[in-house]
Amino acid sequence: QNGAKLRESVLTMTEEWKKAGFVDDGFVSYVSDEKVVAFPWTMIDKITPRPSEQIAADLENLGVEDMQPVITGKKTYIAPFVNAEKPQYLVIEDSFPNGRPALEKGFGVYMADRDTVNLSERMKVTVCLNPVHSATGPLGVVLGYDLFAHMLNTNEDMMKMARMVAYDEGLPVVADPGILSPQAFVDELFNDRFPNEYL
């Protein structure tokens, strides 16, 4: 529903601009007309944690200089690299009244209707991915783990619990969005994503 939130924010700004005399009623009408200006809903899933000092060290060992992350005054971590997982999902509502580039040619990009975008988000957030983190992450912290992957890779009981949350509790009740297979999504979590200690 991020498209709806973005639209609401933009319309609020245009109303304030109108009050301040920066734009006229025609501009507000134009931006408000969903047949002309769209705010497509999206679902994205790609883990991109803060820059890893280990990856920075690995890159420097390969001869790449000045890779160490920097912490800004606002406690934001930045680096000249991005450590991210290979799997990525970007589901975009195909609502572009003025045309669009062939976004679906991108790796992991899916064009869909609004209901499918919403189902994809619900699959990820309420059943397949987030519940596993919510159920096991806090216990991992109590048990002294710093990394989710390390916890699952070394603690049989935590892996068993994570698999139960996803396979036994989640998959039987998930609404299939049709463009992403919930079974394949969960299999990928346990075979590729969760074991990745670089994340």
What are these regions (language model features)?
Residues 2-199:
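Substrate/ligand-engaging "lid" and interaction regions
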